[in-house]
Each structure stands twice: as C-alpha cells, then as structure tokens.
C-alpha cells in the first residue's frame, strides 16, 4: 500500500469510527454540560419536553446523509426507496393519530409550517385574523415584527379584560367587519379550552378558511385531553415537539384534498428544498409512541399536574391568569410578589428551576421585563413527576419568589436560592434521565 493510500485509509478509519469526544472535545463538553443541566434542573418551559432514547437514535441516524427532494414515490434523487418507507410511516401514523385524511410531515419548524399554509392559501396583502401576542398568540400569528405581520393585513383578537378568556363575541364582530380570508385559532400562552366549533361557525359565516395552530396542545389532543380541531378546521398545524414529545419540527394536517395539494406544493418546492429525513424518522417514532395507550395516561397526567401546580401557587398568594388551567401551561401573575418576569426567571434559574418570563394580558411592563412567567408540565411529567412532586415544585417556586421579594434586587436572595437548589437536586435525583442515576 502506498503512503498516500495508507494515509487515506487511516483518515477514513478515524472519520467513520472516532467518537465525538475524540474529534471535537469542545462540542462534546458543551453537550455533556447540557445533559447535566437537564438532569439536575426542573424544566418548566411549557414548549419544552424530553424525547425518548428511540427518538434520539432515529434523529441521530445515517438518514441525515440522504437528500430526498419531493415526496415518497416522486423524488428528484435516486436511492430514496428506504427514506420513502420512513416518510410514509410518519404520514400514516400522523393521520391515524389525529384522524386526518392528509398529512405533510416535512416542515422543519413551527414557523415554516405556518408560513407554508399562508403561502398555500393567502396572497400578500390579504386579511387574516389571529390571537394577539399579548393575549397568548404567537409571532407567526400576525406580529408586526414577523413575516406574517409584514406581508398580510392582520386583524388581531384578544381576551376579555375581566376574566382573561377568549372574547368570542369580539372574534365574530371583527370577522364580520373585516371579512378575513383566513381565521387562525390557537396560541402559545392560553390555558383554557378552545371552542373550535364556534370558530368554524364564524369562519363559515364570513367565508374564511379556519386554520388551527395546535402546536402547544397537540399531545393533549392526541391523548384525548383536549377537543380535536381536526374535524372543524380547514387546515391544522402543529409542531412535533412540545406536548407531542417528538423531535423539533412541524406538521400540517387537513381533510380537504384540494387544500392538501396546495399545502404540498407550498412546502416543496414553495418554501423548502430537501426534507430532513433523520428528523422525519424521529417524528415517525414519536407518533408511534403517541399511538400507544400509555400516551393517553401521560396526557392526563400532564393536565392533572398543571392543575395541581396552579392550585399550589395560588395557595401561596400568586395569581394565575384566567384563574387556572385546562391544559399543560399557566401564566403566573407575579405582581402580588412585587416581582417582574425578568427577575423571577433569573432567580428561579439560580435555584435550578427553568422557566421563561412572559407577558400577561394587558401587561404594563415591557416585553423583555414582563409581569409574569409561563410554566408548563410536559417535561416534568415525562420525567415521572406526579401531583405530589408538582405541589412540592409550587412550594419551591413560592419560596424563591418570597426570598426575591425580601431582597428586592436583581441579585435575588442567595441563601434562599441555594437552599431551594439543593432541594431541587434531591428531587431530580429521584427521577433519572436516560438511565443516569444522581
């Protein structure tokens, strides 16, 4: 063997067999540290969850090597016979899980799935309605800083000031006045049940499409804990992570064949090129997991745990927006503790409790300060926390916030936060992740 060939073989051996730790210790170290953070912290960010080892294996598979522009059976590249199997499984499982006639599993994210629907059903300058960001909507539902707010004429609806519930009379009035081409229902920080039937009635009255973004509650819909929008909406979108507990990505569902054709063309070639086949494999695995009876129990536990956490926080003098929760999340009004969301997020983070600052309806604070935090139970429930643990977590949160109130500074109360941190580490140690103890 020549010296050049020997060098090539040696390089190939390293390339195909060396570990991440050997090749890139900096990235390996960052991943190791993140794993440690996840193991030892309580994750209460409502949009986050923990995937199974099976999903991790699928997403980290050699499918990442394959280009597959197009759809199963109609690809622009050869060698797609096996990734076709993967995508077809993902599609069929998604349809079965949500009772839909058509599914597109290629969107790379929640933003891209919503963009694809807009591309399929709207023209620039068209009017659509969406939930105001300050009432619990999403950036892609018409925020002025987002493409959805720049390309279209957006009419936002909101919640009532007295009870923070959706004002369906306002939705109907705005629809009649503005004649939108599309009405978008769904949000990221609304803790009550959505009345899909009423939304469809309003949409039909004004001749609009009804689009539902169920990204946050898809797992609860699949698990029978929230009414499904699929029988009512012209088109539904959802991320595949959050309460659905899959890899990060998006999906679009419809029962209308004509809309399905438009959606497929909008996703590819309209918006994306080659799909991420390793992620689609992870989606397929997550859908299979969600079709099992155990997932229904998981979804029930998510809601039970959220209600327990909300009630515990209320018992410590905190206000919950709308008075409680019917799903996986809640908005906590921090004003009774004289705290802002920014301060509370930082203080809880120092105590190993992860959440995000969040505006509350009619919030007087700036968006990067806020009067509230958003809390969710999907990740903790996946880990095995039950009602007892979430009551304990509620007490720990109150302990940190009370300490913050006494300190009345950005630095917080170091003694209280350290004491809570030790309790959090003890709690998380009883619920190991990925076979890891301690």
Curated annotation (Swiss-Prot):
Its main location: cytoplasm. Its EC number is 2.1.2.1. Its cofactor is pyridoxal 5'-phosphate. One of its GO terms (cellular component) is cytosol. One of its GO terms (biological process) is tetrahydrofolate interconversion. NCBIfam families: PRK00011.1. Catalyzes the reversible interconversion of serine and glycine with tetrahydrofolate (THF) serving as the one-carbon carrier. This reaction serves as the major source of one-carbon groups required for the biosynthesis of purines, thymidylate, methionine, and other important biomolecules. Also exhibits THF-independent aldolase activity toward beta-hydroxyamino acids, producing glycine and aldehydes, via a retro-aldol mechanism. This is Serine hydroxymethyltransferase. It comes from Brucella abortus (strain 2308). The lineage of its organism: Bacteria, Pseudomonadati, Pseudomonadota, Alphaproteobacteria, Hyphomicrobiales. The gene is glyA.
């Amino acid at each position: 063997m020549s010296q050049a060939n020997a060098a090539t073989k040696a390089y190939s051996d390293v390339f195909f067999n060396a570990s991440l730790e050997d090749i890139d210790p900096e990235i390996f170290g960052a991943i190791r540290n993140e794993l440690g953070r996840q193991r030892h912290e309580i994750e209460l960010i409502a949009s986050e969850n923990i995937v199974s080892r099976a999903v991790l294996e699928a997403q980290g598979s050699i499918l990442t090597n394959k280009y597959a522009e197009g759809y199963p059976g109609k690809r622009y590249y050869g060698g797609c016979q096996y990734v076709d199997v993967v995508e077809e499984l993902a599609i069929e499982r998604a349809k079965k899980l949500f009772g839909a006639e058509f599914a597109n599993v290629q969107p790379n994210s929640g933003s891209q799935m919503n963009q694809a629907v807009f591309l399929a059903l709207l023209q620039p300058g068209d009017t659509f309605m969406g939930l105001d960001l300050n009432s619990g909507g999403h950036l892609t539902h018409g925020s002025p800083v987002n493409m959805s707010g720049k390309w279209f004429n957006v009419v936002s609806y909101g919640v009532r000031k007295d009870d923070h519930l959706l004002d369906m009379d306002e939705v109907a009035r705005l629809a009649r006045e503005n004649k939108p081409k599309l009405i978008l229902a769904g949000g990221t920080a609304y803790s009550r049940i959505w009345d899909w039937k009423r939304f469809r009635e309003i949409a039909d009255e004004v001749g609009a499409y009804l689009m539902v973004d169920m990204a946050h509650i898809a797992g609860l819909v699949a698990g029978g804990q929230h009414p499904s929008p699929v029988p009512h909406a012209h088109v539904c979108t959802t991320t595949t992570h959050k309460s659905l507990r899959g890899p990060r990505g998006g999906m679009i569902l419809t029962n209308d064949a004509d809309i399905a054709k438009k959606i497929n063309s909008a996703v590819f070639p309209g918006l994306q090129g080659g799909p991420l086949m390793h992620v689609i494999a992870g989606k397929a695995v997550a859908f299979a997991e969600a079709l099992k009876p155990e997932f229904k129990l998981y979804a029930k536990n998510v809601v039970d745990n959220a209600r327990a956490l909300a009630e515990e926080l209320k018992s410590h003098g905190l206000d919950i927006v709308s008075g409680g929760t019917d799903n996986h999340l809640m908005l906590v009004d921090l004003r009774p503790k004289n705290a802002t969301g920014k301060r509370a997020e930082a203080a809880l983070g120092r105590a190993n409790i992860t959440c995000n600052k969040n505006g509350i309806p009619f919030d007087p604070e700036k968006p990067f300060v806020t009067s509230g935090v958003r809390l969710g139970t999907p990740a903790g429930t996946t880990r095995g926390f039950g009602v007892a643990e979430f009551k304990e977590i509620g007490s720990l949160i109150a302990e940190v916030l009370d300490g913050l109130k006494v300190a009345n500074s950005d630095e917080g109360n170091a003694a209280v936060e350290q004491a809570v941190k030790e309790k959090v580490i003890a709690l998380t140690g009883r619920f190991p992740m990925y076979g890891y103890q301690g």
